[in-house]
């Protein structure tokens, strides 16, 4: 009986470990730890979340940006779309692989998420979404020009938790002034030697930027 209990406990721990590793971007808040490697190498280590983004980056000819060898240097911030978002784009457009996406589109999608300065979660200003659905920019926050030339209004906000306003984790919200769509960051402060990654929610869509 004791052996059975120990075996069951081991199985449970294994399942929890796999779940936390595979779906670590579903929960809001900060990602764990620093990564002593380039951003490109970090993406390579987590194929589940970043494989399709890497394929898009390669197709766009922008690997050097994430390896820290481009003119942007080694202090970039990247709002990264996970493979789930890219997979949804392929499905919605009747495509099966990233190679079917036009090169110019790949380049635009990649550069839309690139901010050419290092910004951690606490570096972004607090703000609040406008109560008027026709007004794109709310109060606070800050507007940034991305490497693609698009402008994003970015702010942080603490959500409600257990019915208490402001008791939840601080999250980053990104609003494209082109599309007027707001997107949430799932995990922030993923630090690498060539910049910081803020991973977008799994329900983020490439056209939202």
Task: Please give the residue ranges for each predicted region.
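Bacterial N-terminal signal peptides that target proteins for export
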Residues: 1-8
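C-terminal motif of bacterial Sec signal peptides marking the signal peptidase cleavage site
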Residues: 15-19
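Mature, structured domains of secreted/extracytosolic soluble proteins
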Residues: 20-209
């Amino acid at each position: 009986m004791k052996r059975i209990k120990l075996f069951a406990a081991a199985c449970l721990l294994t399942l929890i470990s796999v779940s936390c590793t595979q779906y670590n971007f579903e929960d809001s808040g900060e990602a764990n730890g620093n990564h002593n490697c380039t951003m490109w190498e970090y993406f390579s280590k987590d194929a589940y979340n970043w494989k399709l983004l890497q394929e898009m980056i390669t197709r766009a000819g922008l690997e050097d940006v994430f390896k820290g060898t481009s003119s942007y240097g080694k202090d970039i911030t990247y709002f990264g779309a996970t493979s789930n978002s890219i997979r949804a784009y392929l499905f919605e457009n009747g495509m099966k692989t990233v190679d079917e996406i036009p090169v110019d589109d790949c380049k635009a999608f990649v550069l839309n998420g690139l901010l050419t300065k290092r910004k951690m979660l606490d570096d972004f200003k607090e703000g609040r979404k406008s109560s008027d659905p026709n007004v794109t920019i709310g109060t606070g926050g800050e507007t940034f020009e991305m490497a693609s030339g698009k402008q994003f209004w970015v702010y942080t906000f603490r959500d409600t938790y257990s019915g208490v306003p402001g008791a939840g984790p601080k999250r980053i919200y990104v609003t494209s002034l082109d599309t007027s769509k707001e997107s949430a960051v799932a995990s922030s402060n993923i630090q690498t030697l060539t910049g910081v990654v803020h991973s977008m929610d799994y329900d983020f869509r490439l056209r939202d930027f």
